[in-house]
């Protein structure tokens, strides 16, 4: 059975690299890259979906695409890149909690 993989944080270097590599994996049928801004680099044949993991809509994406694997790369290590510590915590903590909740509710993950 081939996998459908969702990769978060594809606009950042590491997330984009993971998405691009997964598109070359023969065991993976479909790769969906998610971020709030389009990636400035190639993500291979991965499909880009503009979405914020802090938004409950992420659950709909998991369900509609029948995602069975999630690779969470949407973490900000430097507060300056997020606009300060508060937005950094919101993205890292609230976003991760929302994504994990969506995974838990999903029938396919």
Q: Where are each of the predicted segments found?
A:
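Rossmann-fold cofactor-recognition segment
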Residues: 43-56
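Conserved cofactor-binding/catalytic machinery of classical short-chain dehydrogenase/reductase
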Residues: 69, 95-98
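Local beta-strand N-terminus motif with an aromatic residue
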Residues: 2, 66-67, 109
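Conserved glycine-rich Rossmann-like NAD(P)H-binding loop of the short-chain dehydrogenase/reductase
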Residues: 27-38
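N-terminal Rossmann NAD(P)H-binding glycine-rich loop of SDR-like oxidoreductase domains
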Residues: 2-27
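NAD(P)H-binding glycine-rich loop region in Rossmannoid oxidoreductase-like domains
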Residues: 53-91
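Conserved Rossmann-fold NAD(P)-dependent oxidoreductase catalytic core, especially the SDR/UDP-sugar
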Residues: 97-109
């Amino acid at each position: 059975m081939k996998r459908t993989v969702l990769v978060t944080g594809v606009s950042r270097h590491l997330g984009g690299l993971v998405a691009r590599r997964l598109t070359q994996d023969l065991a993976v049928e479909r790769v969906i890259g998610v971020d709030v801004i389009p990636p400035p680099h190639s993500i291979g044949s991965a499909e880009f979906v503009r979405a914020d993991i802090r938004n409950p809509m992420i659950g709909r994406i998991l369900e509609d695409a029948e995602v069975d694997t999630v690779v969470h790369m949407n973490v900000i290590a430097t507060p300056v890149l997020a606009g300060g510590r508060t937005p950094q915590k919101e993205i890292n903590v609230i976003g991760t909690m929302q994504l994990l909740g969506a995974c838990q509710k999903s029938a396919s993950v």
